[in-house]
Swiss-Prot record:
A double ring-shaped homohexamer of HslV is capped on each side by a ring-shaped HslU homohexamer. The assembly of the HslU/HslV complex is dependent on binding of ATP. Belongs to the peptidase T1B family. HslV subfamily. This is ATP-dependent protease subunit HslV. Its EC number is 3.4.25.2. Transmembrane segments: none annotated. Gene3D superfamilies: Glutamine Phosphoribosylpyrophosphate, subunit 1, domain 1. The lineage of its organism: Bacteria, Pseudomonadati, Pseudomonadota, Gammaproteobacteria, Alteromonadales. Its main location: cytoplasm. Keywords: Allosteric enzyme, Cytoplasm, Hydrolase, Metal-binding, Protease, Sodium, Threonine protease.
């Protein structure tokens, strides 16, 4: 699987992800980029789950962003509705983390759109490890969002066998 973590602090939001692609117990690729910028570089997005499924969802989400002039929450809700009702989309297995200058969200295949506590999101096989590390760093240090995301992803990769040390990190400063 993978690990994606998003941290927001001091007018900065960051989404970071590792690069491991696994097929069962085999590592197929170690440098996949699972984090990207969307909608004129104003939205960050990361995925965990099936790679082909995630790319389909990225395309659909970007279309929703265009349709709704970049309004993140409305686009996420519309994608989640489609994901729940469309027969093809219902079979996709992936989670998305999306963020803009104001909001961070998790979009699930069940049609849920969740705004997390503490401006912190972590998903994937190492998500719990990354979230615990990031929360501890948020509460006990003055590190930047970028530093917290990077350190928490490193900790997750040290613990989770489905997460590696290759990192893709995108940040928005606002």
């Amino acid at each position: 699987m993978t690990t994606i973590v998003s941290v927001r602090r001091n007018n900065q939001v960051v989404i970071a992800g590792d690069g491991q692609v696994s097929l069962g117990n085999t590592v197929m690729k170690g440098n996949a980029k699972k984090v990207r910028r969307l909608y004129h570089n104003k939205v960050l997005a990361g995925f965990a789950g099936g790679t082909a499924d995630a790319f389909t969802l990225f395309e659909r989400f970007e279309a929703k962003l265009e349709m709704h002039q970049g309004h993140l929450l409305r686009s996420a809700v519309e994608l989640a509705k489609d994901w729940r009702t469309d027969r093809m989309l219902r079979k996709l297995e992936a989670l998305l983390v999306v963020a803009d200058a104001e909001t961070s969200l998790i979009i699930t295949g069940n049609g849920d759109v969740v705004q997390p506590e503490h401006d912190l999101v972590a998903i994937g096989s190492g998500g719990n490890y990354a979230q615990a590390a990031a929360l501890a760093l948020l509460q006990n240090t003055e590190l930047s969002a970028l530093e917290i995301a990077e350190k928490s992803l490193t900790i997750a990769a040290d613990i989770c066998v489905f997460t590696n040390q290759f990192k893709t990190i995108e940040e928005l400063n606002y």
